[in-house]
């Protein structure tokens, strides 16, 4: 994941 929720879980 990256950044903070709700962006967690995505890998960029």
Swiss-Prot record:
GO cellular component, one term: extracellular region
Entry keywords, A to Z: Amidation, Neuropeptide, Secreted
Keyword 4Fe-4S applies: no
Domain of life of the source: Eukaryota
Keyword ATP-binding among record annotations: no
Predominant location category: secreted
GO biological processes: neuropeptide signaling pathway
Modified residues (Phenylalanine amide): 12
Location in the cell: Secreted
Family, per entry: Belongs to the FARP (FMRFamide related peptide) family.
Record-given protein name: FMRFamide-like neuropeptide FLP7
Record organism: Penaeus monodon (Giant tiger prawn)
